[in-house]
């Protein structure tokens, strides 16, 4: 299984291409991130890769997130240990098209929801 490291500076299109290639070849890829910005880039990369795979291979993806400890051997005195996130991305059979899952069909306003609940 290929292991990819993602930072806040990772280019989404390149990450998506790498994810798609690894899924086509091996059916699985591991993505490691530290920090919210890096996680954001990783999720965007998975979304774009999912489109690539749906368009040319009729494949979908599943994601299994887990917390992982990051090596603390380089921490200076007083620094806290860091926890990262590992995303295991696997090939999955397509059940819904990405448009059905991710597109917003109508705008929902908070006031409309609250009005419905109060009736």
What residues fall within each predicted segment?
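Conserved mixed alpha/beta catalytic, RNA-binding, or beta-rich assembly cores of soluble enzyme
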Residues: 2-28, 46, 50, 83-85
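C-terminal edge-of-domain segments
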Residues: 56-118
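Short glycine-rich, basic-tinged beta-strand/loop micro-motifs
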Residues: 22-40
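Generic serine detector
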Residues: 7-8, 18, 30, 37, ...
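Short, hydrophobic/π-rich interface segment
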Residues: 36-64
């Amino acid at each position: 299984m290929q292991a990819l490291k993602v930072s806040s500076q990772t280019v989404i299109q390149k990450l998506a291409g790498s994810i798609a290639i690894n899924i086509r070849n091996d059916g699985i890829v591991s993505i490691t991130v530290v920090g919210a910005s890096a996680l954001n880039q990783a999720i965007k990369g998975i979304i774009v890769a999912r489109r690539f795979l749906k368009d040319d291979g009729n494949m979908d993806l599943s994601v299994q997130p887990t917390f992982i400890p990051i090596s603390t051997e380089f921490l200076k005195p007083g620094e806290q240990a860091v926890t990262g996130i590992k995303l295991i991305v696997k090939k999955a059979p397509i059940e819904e098209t990405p448009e059905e899952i991710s597109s917003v069909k109508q705008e929902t306003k908070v006031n409309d929801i609250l009005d419905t609940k109060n009736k």
